[in-house]
């Protein structure tokens, strides 16, 4: 019986971890040129000039009509990782 409760508890944790909503304090962004990948970034990045430059690029390309339904940053994934790794 304990094993069944343990398995049910694990299922609840997995379903919560795959939720589409970003956790408190984070923003979900989609990054990539052809294949988009979802990243969660801390809200504190929004005040950083280098991250704001990525947001400006997104605004220039998409305006406020993002094809993924969320914020899309049109740059190569490695560029995004390079920029955000400097912010940590």
Curated annotation (Swiss-Prot):
Annotated signal sequence is none
What is the induction comment? Strongly induced by auxin.
Would the keyword Transmembrane helix be found if you checked this record's keyword annotation? no
CC annotations in GO:
plasma membrane
Q: Where in the cell is it found?
A: Cell membrane
| Bilayer topology annotation | Peripheral membrane protein
Q: Which residues cross the membrane?
A: none
User: For this chain's UniProt record, which GO biological process terms are given?
Assistant: auxin-activated signaling pathway; response to auxin
Keyword set for this entry? Answer: Auxin signaling pathway, Cell membrane, Developmental protein, Growth regulation, Membrane
- The disulfide bridges present are none
Family stated for the protein in its record: Belongs to the ARG7 family.
Main function = Functions as a positive effector of cell expansion through modulation of auxin transport.
The protein here is known as Auxin-responsive protein SAUR21
């Amino acid at each position: 019986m304990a094993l069944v409760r343990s398995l049910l508890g694990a299922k609840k944790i997995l379903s919560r971890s795959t939720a589409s909503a970003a956790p408190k304090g984070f923003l979900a962004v989609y990054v990539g040129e052809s294949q988009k990948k979802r990243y969660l970034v801390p809200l504190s990045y929004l005040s950083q000039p280098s991250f704001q430059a990525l947001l400006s690029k997104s605004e220039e390309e998409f305006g406020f009509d993002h094809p993924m339904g969320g914020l899309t940053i049109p740059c190569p994934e490695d560029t995004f990782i390079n920029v955000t790794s400097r912010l940590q």
